[in-house]
A protein has these predicted regions:
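Sec-dependent bacterial lipoprotein signal peptides
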Residues: 1-21
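Bacterial Sec-dependent N-terminal signal peptides
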Residues: 16-47, 179-181, 203, 245
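Extracellular adhesion/carbohydrate-recognition regions
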Residues: 34-130, 201-203, 213, 232-242
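Secondary-structure transition/turn motif
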Residues: 74-77, 219-223
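An exposed tryptophan-centered "aromatic clamp" motif
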Residues: 116-129, 135-218
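Carbohydrate-recognition loop of C-type lectin domains
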Residues: 221-232
Length: 245
């Protein structure tokens, strides 16, 4: 009798173990595969092509991670800053995005501010990615274009001057050659992607300096313009949009 009870107990125990194992397998099999990890955010460097959504341009500067920075548009044109004598920013300009937003709040800006119309023409719908750069942002574009830094860029306004180490004799020619190589490299990044090459000309900033004058930057000399007639809002200078990413 004891043998029969023992056999029955073992049979019941084996059945219970088998059922538990099947339930566990079924539970395990019902779980979906784990979600694959998201791809890492790409790290950019100066000269890279950035393209995401409706934004496409060449990287001008990046932060320490390489994930965020500034880029410049592929195209440029020559245009008047404004046909109106007024202070769109109250002579307190900030970043290019802020300055551009101040102009866009004016009900007639599309009629009287052609430089801003050109700078924002690639914005789609309510998106406001592109803007006319401030002096500080133009300084970063100049650095990407020539390899030289500028001073006095705090706050995005003021007089800018290229910082070049003083060189004489053969060193001068070498420095000039290095700068030209840098320009060729950056322009190739633009033209290889269907864009317009940068030029050693005066470029408008969005940094207003009064009712009738605006800061502008000479990409050839690396200096801000100080001739009043060249700073008149009705003068024609190069316009090149920038965007943050």
């Amino acid at each position: 009798m004891k043998t029969i009870y023992l056999k029955c107990f073992l049979a019941v125990f084996a059945a219970a173990a088998l059922f538990a194992g099947c339930s566990k397998n079924a539970e395990t099999d019902s779980n979906p595969d784990p979600t694959p990890p998201a791809p890492p955010t790409p790290a950019y460097k100066v000269g890279d092509l950035y393209t995401k959504g409706f934004v496409k341009g060449i990287v001008v500067s990046v932060d320490e991670t390489g994930e965020h920075g500034l880029l410049v548009s592929l195209n440029q044109c020559e245009e008047v800053w404004s046909y109106k004598v007024e202070e769109a920013m109250g002579s307190l300009p900030g970043s290019g995005a802020y300055n551009t937003s101040c102009v866009q709040k004016l009900h007639d800006w599309k009629e009287y501010y052609p430089a801003f119309v050109e700078a924002t023409k690639d914005n789609v719908g309510a998106l406001k990615n592109w803007f006319l750069p401030s002096m500080n942002e133009l300084a970063k574009l100049y650095s990407a274009y020539t390899g030289h830094e500028t001073n006095d860029t705090e706050g995005g306004t003021g007089s800018l001057n290229s910082i070049r180490s003083p060189k004489t004799g053969p060193e001068t020619a070498s420095a000039s050659s290095e700068e030209q190589q840098r320009k060729d490299f950056f322009n190739k990044c633009l033209t290889d992607n269907g864009g317009d090459a940068m030029e050693d000309k005066v470029y408008w900033s969005s940094s207003e300096n009064g009712p009738s004058i605006v800061f502008a930057f000479d990409m050839g000399t690396g200096k801000s313009i100080d001739t009043p007639s060249d700073l008149d809002k009705r003068a024609r200078h190069m316009v090149r949009a920038m965007a943050s990413f």
